[in-house]
Design a protein with these regions (language model features):
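SAM-dependent methyltransferase
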Residues: 125, 145-213
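A short glycine-rich, Lys/Arg-flanked "PGG" loop and its adjoining helix->strand segment in the class I
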Residues: 128-140
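C-terminal lobe and adjacent flexible extensions of AdoMet/dcAdoMet transferase-like proteins
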Residues: 213-242
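Class I SAM-dependent methyltransferase SAM/SAH-binding core
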Residues: 55-100
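A short acidic, Gly/Pro-enriched loop at the edge of an enzyme's catalytic core
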Residues: 102-110
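Conserved class I S-adenosyl-L-methionine
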Residues: 1-53
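A short SAM/SAH-binding and catalytic strip from SAM-dependent methyltransferases
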Residues: 109-125
Length: 242
């Protein structure tokens, strides 16, 4: 089984932005999300984007006026972010997101951990560790935004085959196997090169996180949960340090 980093290096990074619907579409959605929820600088104007990928959160945050530290394990996705960000105030760091304190500014107004990044952690204990560490690092009235997939209900039989995205030259599908605490995600990517289809395949584990448990972790750490929503299988929470 590949680690998260190996899975992205070997397969996912090369097609990630396309797989997610396209870079500009994701930027548009997150710009609207941050605007709709009044996410703009009010104090130190510093943000840390955990699992930043190619910049779906970091770029809109920087456009809104934040100085952003973007952390991800994928060198290729960070390179894509740097290329797209131009002169925006974004600093990229290649590291495990649990090590964010080693790279963060002294004052932090907002953390984002979106795009299903939270499920990439290995254990519930790591999730709790991250939430408590973020709480300690945030300045007063600081915000944490979580966005992750609800995988508590098991898909069965053929429903475990997910057609993610396809076009005339690329096809991305995945197959899910459920374990007690994790889901094994088997990704299969076909790409047409010189009139021949080439296949890449890899799998890794995602952590199954219930929305209620995640909310309880936030409250236990000291956060006030200001938004709690489930839409199209994605759980979104906005929590504020009290």
């Amino acid at each position: 089984m590949a680690s998260v980093k190996e899975h992205y290096d070997n397969l996912l990074a090369s097609c990630y932005s396309w797989m997610c619907g396209g870079f500009e579409l994701k930027l548009k959605k997150n710009r609207a999300f941050f605007q709709d929820h009044s996410i703009r600088p009010a104090h130190s104007a510093t943000a840390v984007d955990l699992g930043s990928g190619s910049g779906f959160q970091a770029i809109p945050l920087a456009e809104a006026g934040f100085k952003v530290t973007a952390i991800d394990v994928s060198r290729d996705l960070l390179a894509e972010l740097n290329k797209t960000a131009g002169k925006l105030p974004i600093r990229t760091i290649q590291d495990d997101l649990l090590n964010f304190a080693e790279h963060s500014p002294a004052k932090i107004e907002i953390f984002t951990c979106m795009g299903d990044t939270l499920t990439h952690l290995k254990t519930p204990a790591e999730v709790e560790e991250l939430i408590h560490s973020v709480y300690r690092a945030l300045e007063k009235e600081g915000i944490l935004i979580l966005d992750f997939r609800d995988m508590m209900v098991e898909l069965t039989q053929l429903d475990r085959f997910i057609p993610v995205r396809s076009d005339s030259k690329r096809i991305f599908t995945c197959f899910l196997e459920y374990e007690k605490c994790h889901v094994k995600v088997h990704d299969i990517f076909y790409e047409k090169i010189d009139d021949q289809w080439k296949m890449k395949k890899s799998f890794f584990r995602k952590l199954r996180i219930s929305s209620q448990w995640a909310k309880e972790c936030l409250l236990k750490a000291g956060f006030k949960v200001e938004k709690y929503d489930i839409e199209n299988g994605m759980i979104t929470m906005i929590a504020r340090k009290r």
